[in-house]
Amino acid sequence: PSSAASDVYKRQLLISVDSPERGIELYASELYKADRAYREYVTAWRRAHPEARSVDTDLQESYRSYQHALGQAWQMQVDKLERWSFKGVDAQSDFYEREISPVVGAKKKIAVIVSDALRYEAAQELAERINRENRFSTDLKKQYGVLPSYTQLGMAALLPHDPSSAHDSLAFGKDHYGVLVDGRSATGTENRDAILGDVGGKAIQAGELLKMKSIDVKALYRSCNVLYVYHNVIDAHGDSDKTEDEVFDSCETTFRELTDVVKKLAGGNVNNMIITSDHGFLYQGFDLDDSEWLSTQPQGDEVWVKKRRFTIGSRLAPDRAFITFTAAQAGLDDPDGEGVTIQIPNSIMRLRKQGTGSHYVHGGSALPEIVVPVLHVSK
């Protein structure tokens, strides 16, 4: 749009997004549609012009100004937060307690399918596709994700942990990147299976499940109260700079594979399922302007982890270019008193660093990164 049109747009967003809770509400009810329309357009364009490196410039520009307008409006609300928490909005870190405990407590069973980086707008389309199967009904809800919005922390947040303990039960491990749930590593299927074992649960990879005969799926489901099925296609492509621009094609693959997982589970007598994810993502199929890169770098006692959209360190110095949260403000534990701090570049800004792509990113606090789907599927 012309700059006049985009100014009107920006004002409209600033007026509408008038509280942190309202921002999440608005994204989940309306604003996600812009991200979906962009994904559908880019997918269609690339099919029609396989040789073209970049997508139609006008579209890119209008999507860029939309992302910036929303990013700024949302940032104004995030800046007001004392801690990473939203009144009356379900939290990803309460997922097990809220969605699974009551089911298991009532002596019923449930399966949870966790698809890495299945963002909210994609889950909306997935729900429509599952509904077309005519054997299932779906109900899509939202929850706000953990911060930083990256795989290890999001995956850990979805597991059973003790929300009533005096300390927050999620903490970074020794490498300050892997995550501990009540002191145990939550990295990888094996460790997650062990944590789920405490509540009579099991974990399996989607690829493994899809190869099973239905009699074996029945036996597996009979043997546990809750079954977690892990799926990773979107993030596997998005996180590599060689394949990040295939991320929308991976959404298509994901819709097909998750529909197959749902059918496979249903054939194994699973009537009750939830599809969710660890985090969402931001994607733009064009190179970033200089203005979209932060000129600042994080400073502090120590910088342990630096990614495009977040930094984890010790006593990081507050800076206007970032939002800065202590572990406690982010709902995390700091068991060794290391002054754990996280910093997130404002709006949709990226940090400069060597390697890794910049079109597909996550880890920050932007709405497409942190509004996480909770899709109930019943047979």
Predicted regions and their residues:
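Single conserved hydrophobic/aromatic residue that forms the stacking wall/gate
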Residues: 1-5, 9
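A long, amphipathic alpha-helix that forms part
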Residues: 239-273
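Beta-strand elements within well-structured catalytic alpha/beta cores of enzymes
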Residues: 107-126, 227-230, 265, 271-283, ...
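Short secondary-structure boundary/capping segments
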Residues: 126-133, 242-248, 283-301
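Low-complexity, highly charged intrinsically disordered N-terminal segments
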Residues: 18-82
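Active-site regions of oxyanion-processing enzymes, predominantly non-cytosolic
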Residues: 216-233
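Active-site nucleophile/metal-coordination loop of metallo-enzymes that catalyze phosphate/sulfate
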Residues: 86-106, 120-214, 329-340, 350, ...
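Active-site neighborhoods of enzymes that stabilize oxyanions during catalysis
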Residues: 139, 233-234, 290-291, 296-379
